[in-house]
Amino acid sequence: MARNIQSLERAAAMLRLLAGGERRLGLSDIASTLGLAKGTAHGILRSLQAEGFVEQEPASGRYQLGAELLALGNSYLDVHELRARALVWTDDLARSSGEAAYLGVLHQQGVLIVHHVFRPDDSRQVLEVGAMHPLHSTAHGKVISAFDPVAHSEVLEGDRATLTGRTVTEAAAFEEVLDLTRARGWALDLEETWEGVASLAAPVHDRRRMAVGAVGVTGPVERLCPDGAPATELVTAVRDCAAAVSRDLGAGRF
C-alpha cells in the first residue's frame, strides 16, 4: 500500500484548521494545534501562500484562506450543479434518440465527461464518466471551443493530433469548423475521433450566458449519419436538451 506524503497531509490539515473556528490564526497557533515545529509550519504556509491557497494579513501577520481556494470551490460547485441540472434532460435525450448521451466540460486541454447515460438497449456498454476526450475532434470539444474563449485558446495553442483520416488539424480549416459551429449552434464529429463513430453536441450556458459545457449523443455513424449528415430530428433533440439544461442553470430562453 502506497504511503501518504507527509507534507501534503500537513498542508491539508492546515487548510482544514483555517477553514474552521477563527478566520485568522497566527503561526504559533497553527504550529501548536497541529503539533508542528514553527519552522516546519512556516515553510508549509509559505508554499500555500505562494499558490494562493493561504493569505497573510500584513498588519497582524495572521493567516487565512486564500482566494484561490474559493475559485477551486466554485469550479467544483459549478460542475456538480451542471451535472445535477442535466440528469433528467440527458436521460430524456438518450431515450428519445436511442443513443448514448454525454455531458462534457473543459478540463486540461480536453473534454472531461461528467455524465454518461447508456444507450437504452441491452448491449454491453462501459461507463465513461471521468474519461477525457479530445478537444479538437469530438463534437463536444468543438462546441466548447467555439463558445468558450478559454477553450478556444487552448485548442489553438495545443496539439491537434490526427486521429483518423477525417480529423481537421490545420488551424485555418479548424477555425472554419468553429465558425460553422457558432452559426448553427451545434457541432458534428463524423469519424474524426474514432472510425465508425459519430457524435453530435450543442452548448450549455449558465446564468451569465457563458458556455459551461456541452451535451450530445454518440453512436455508430450508420445510425447517426446514414446519409452523411444527422437527421433534423436528432439535431433538434440535442439542441432542445442543451437549451433545457441551460434554462435550469438560469440562462433564460435559448
UniProtKB/Swiss-Prot annotation:
Alphabetical UniProt keywords: Activator, DNA-binding, Glycerol metabolism, Transcription, Transcription regulation
Pfam (any one): IclR_C
Name of the coding gene: gylR
Organism of derivation: Streptomyces griseus
GO biological process: glycerol metabolic process; negative regulation of DNA-templated transcription
Stated name of the protein: Glycerol operon regulatory protein
GO molecular function, one term: DNA binding
Domain IclR-ED: 82-251
Domain of life: Bacteria
